[in-house]
Amino acid sequence: MRKLLTLALLAASSASLFAQCDALFISEYIEGWSNNKAIEIYNPTGSAIDMSDFRLERYSNGATAAQENQKVVLSGTIQPNDVLVYVLDKQDPDGVDFEAPVWDELAEKADIWLCPVYEENNAMYFNGNDAMVLRQISSNAVLDIFGVIGEDPGSAGWDEITQNHTLVRRPEVTS
């Protein structure tokens, strides 16, 4: 009985923590081998949000500013208490080397594909040592940051946990 009560209290406190959020945030960061890159964005609000007023920005290798081709305007609508998964657009099953396709497991999770041509836009080509920013365009407000802008932790990423890994935001992190 005590375990059941503890579990119920834990679930209630987790729900209340999410209730404290009032802005979009990066809920999952996937930096897999080769082109297996994705960002999941969570909408903790009670309203659907049109993503055309938001963008992802990549601050490459310790840069203090994102270049124009490292910023991508998002699309789609995130329903209340739901996510959209943005995946690097490498879908050609015959692609090799730099054009290798994302793995089927990741492709199945994709809601929206981004940045198919590196030379045109490479915001989704992060590699474990780049900071990623979710920004609202109309207000220029930074809603969330993954990593540290202006810091290059080396090719292994922050404490060797960001390169070739998937990171999921812990439920108790609300700001």
Give the positions of each predicted feature.
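Sec-dependent N-terminal signal peptides
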Residues: 3-15, 19
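A structural motif detector for short, solvent-exposed N-terminal "entry" segments of globular domains
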Residues: 19-61, 124-127, 150
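Structural recognition of the beta-strand scaffold that forms the well-ordered cores
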Residues: 25-28, 40, 55-58, 83-87, ...
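Acidic glycine-/aspartate-rich tracts in secreted/extracellular proteins
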Residues: 32-33, 44-48, 60-64, 89-93, ...
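Short, surface-exposed secondary-structure edge patches
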Residues: 46-48, 73-77, 123, 159
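Intrinsically disordered, low-complexity Pro/Gly/Ser/Thr-rich segments with frequent PxxP/GP/PP motifs
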Residues: 66-96
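Short, Lys/Arg- and Gly-enriched loop/turn segments at beta-strand edges
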Residues: 91-109
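Conserved beta-structured recognition patch
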Residues: 112-175
